[in-house]
């Protein structure tokens, strides 16, 4: 299975033992933050199971949603990405594969996306801070992911940044949008860039 392959070939090699899918199968619920009271699909408190309905229908294991982790293990994964697949002196993921996945795929269509990763807007450097994605400071080489439930990771090899922000935007319900309205995730990221630029 894909999940077993990723666990053995990536997560274990970087020492990430608290990252994976369906954590309710491995850990007591006291160690897992509840996600949301789902009043639409499952009609219950989601606790240790994937939030995304499509991934839930796939048994909680998918390539687009459902990965649970501690901040520490997620940072290890981001460091693997920042180092272009190298970790602890071993090339775990091909540098060429990561380069391809983190490159803009369709710039001619003004599409900023990589394969599985967000990228800054193509004209980010021309925009005001409030119009940028994710922030004005992000280099064209940077990449990351902004999750629906409130997670945010951003890697910027140009400035040696690996940024992990874990929160729960959808608790108690998905209608809680304060995190997005206040731009907390990207404001903190810009503060990281500002501290680097001020040196």
Model segments located where?
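Short, surface-exposed loop or secondary-structure junction motifs
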Residues: 1-140
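Structured C-terminal helix/loop/strand segments within mature extracytoplasmic catalytic/sensor domains
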Residues: 73, 145-199
